[in-house]
C-alpha cells in the first residue's frame, strides 16, 4: 500500500504541473486516477483530481495483472467517484466483453492494443467470438465479417475474403 500511496502523490503533483504547463492551450487534458486496488486511495486520488479543471479522467493502474473481478470492482468504484459530466476513460482494456463490463460500470472511453494485435494476426472480433480470417475456408467467402452486426463496416464494406 505504501508504494501505491507514493505513486498517487507523485501523480497528484504531476497533475498540477501539467495544468500549469498547458496554459491557455485548447488541448484537452485528462487526469489519471490512481490507487491500485485500494478503494480509499482511489477516493483520495479522485477527490483531489476532480477539484482541478481537467477535461476528463482516466482510470489508471488497472489491466496490469490483477484478477478480472478485482479490475471490474475497482473500475466500478473509481468510475462512481468521477463526475458524470466529463469523460471517464479506462486505460489498457480492450476485449469486447471487457468493454461492455466497463461501460456497465460507468466508463465512456477506452484504448488498448488488443484489437490491433488481434487484427495483425488475421483475426477479428465478432458477435460470435474470434474469427480466424486466414483460414483457407474464408479465401473466397462473400459472407459478411459478422452477419449479426449492423454497423456500416459489417453491412457494406467487408466480406471475409477482403478483410485480410
Q: Across the structure, where does each feature detected by a protein language model lie?
A:
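Cys/His-rich metal-chelating microdomains
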Residues: 157
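Non-catalytic, usually N-terminal nucleic-acid engagement modules in DNA/RNA processing proteins
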Residues: 1-24, 136-139
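Glycine-rich phosphate/ribose-binding loops and adjacent secondary-structure elements
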Residues: 21-30, 34-145
Amino acid at each position: 500500500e505504501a508504494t501505491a500511496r507514493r505513486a498517487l502523490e507523485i501523480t497528484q503533483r504531476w497533475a498540477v504541473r501539467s495544468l500549469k504547463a498547458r496554459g491557455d492551450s485548447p488541448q484537452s487534458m485528462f487526469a489519471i486516477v490512481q490507487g491500485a486496488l485500494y478503494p480509499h486511495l482511489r477516493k483520495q486520488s479522485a477527490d483531489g483530481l476532480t477539484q482541478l479543471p481537467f477535461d476528463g479522467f482516466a482510470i489508471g493502474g488497472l489491466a496490469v495483472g490483477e484478477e478480472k473481478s478485482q479490475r471490474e470492482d475497482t473500475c466500478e468504484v473509481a468510475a462512481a467517484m468521477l463526475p458524470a459530466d466529463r469523460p471517464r476513460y479506462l486505460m489498457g482494456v480492450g476485449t469486447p466483453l471487457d468493454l461492455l463490463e466497463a461501460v456497465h460500470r460507468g466508463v465512456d472511453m477506452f484504448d488498448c492494443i488488443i484489437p490491433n494485435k488481434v487484427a495483425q494476426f488475421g483475426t477479428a472480433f465478432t458477435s460470435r467470438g474470434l474469427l480466424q480470417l486466414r483460414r483457407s475456408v474464408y479465401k473466397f467467402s462473400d459472407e459478411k465479417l459478422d452477419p449479426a452486426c449492423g454497423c456500416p463496416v459489417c453491412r457494406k464494406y467487408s466480406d471475409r475474403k477482403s478483410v485480410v
